Design a protein with these regions (language model features):
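C-terminal catalytic "cap/lid" subdomain
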Residues: 1-266
Length: 266
């Protein structure tokens, strides 16, 4: 039986959560923080316990960024650096898998680059089977191709797996007109269209990912995951973060929300 969230019933039944590599470390640091990983796992496990089918795309920038590695050096080729960055996402994925399963949340780690000893290969039908069995699916190695960001991988997997929303977890509580950590006068947007994001070059996701979400009509919610319970709040329809989509943000108790929550994902 599904657990009842203190924030109310979920609006969405299948969600793609995008976690950057910096989610796995303390602010301003690199590597792995057990405390940060545990905090992510607690929130994700509570969401899964409410009956939400959850796929998580993980980044690897806390360990290595391929694009950064190639600056000012010619020893490591750019494509190689990107592959190195992909392997970093597997480290994060393994850590998150263990943290989730330690909380009793059945989890599967899938990769687009085969690593049979430690993860399952990404096969769409297999991923869907896991989701339908209420297992959390952790997706590592991005798309498996260099020069493609994990944001784009998240947009691709969100569409491929029939997710209703792509939730991008960040350190700030939405999308701003400027960097709020540098500009105290920056204004937070509550709702945006894809066209506004592209026209104004707002820092939501890379342009390829935004274009993919536009083409597939996959809404994006950018929110601050550092605040405990925010993942549950977002899924329950509380007005947090910034909503990017063709239609207005669904809200708890609205007709659109009721229809979304009652529909079973395929």
């Amino acid at each position: 039986m599904d657990v009842v969230s203190p924030y109310g019933p979920p609006l969405f039944r299948r969600v793609l959560l995008k976690l950057s590599g910096e989610s796995f470390c303390r602010p301003g640091e690199g590597g792995l923080s057990v405390d940060e990983i545990s905090r992510i796992a607690r929130q994700a496990s509570r969401v899964a316990a409410c009956g939400v089918q959850l796929a998580i795309v993980v980044g690897g920038g806390n360990i290595l960024r391929g694009a950064t590695l190639t600056r000012n050096q010619t020893v490591i080729q750019e494509a190689t650096a990107h592959y190195m960055g992909m392997t970093a996402t597997v480290i994060n994925g393994l850590a998150l898998q263990d943290a989730l399963e330690g909380l009793g949340c059945e989890t599967r780690l899938l990769t687009t680059i085969r690593m049979d000893e430690i993860a399952e290969p990404f096969i769409r039908r297999r991923a869907l089977s896991h989701l339908n069995r209420n297992r959390v699916v952790v997706l590592a190695t991005g798309t498996g191709s260099p020069f493609v960001t994990t944001d784009t991988a998240a947009a691709l997997r969100g569409k491929e797996l029939g997710c209703e929303v792509l939730m991008k977890a960040t350190r700030v509580d939405g999308v701003y007109s400027a960097d709020p950590e540098k500009n105290p006068h920056a204004v937070r947007y509550e709702n945006l269209t894809y066209e506004q994001v592209l026209r104004d070059d707002l820092k939501v996701m890379d342009m390829t990912a935004i274009g993919m979400c536009l083409d597939s009509d996959l809404p994006i919610l950018v929110f601050n995951f550092k605040k405990e319970g925010n993942i549950e709040r977002a899924i329950a329809g509380e007005t947090i973060g910034t909503w990017v989509g063709k239609r207005p943000r669904p809200r708890a108790g609205s007709a659109a929300a009721t229809a979304t929550a009652s529909d079973s994902p395929t």
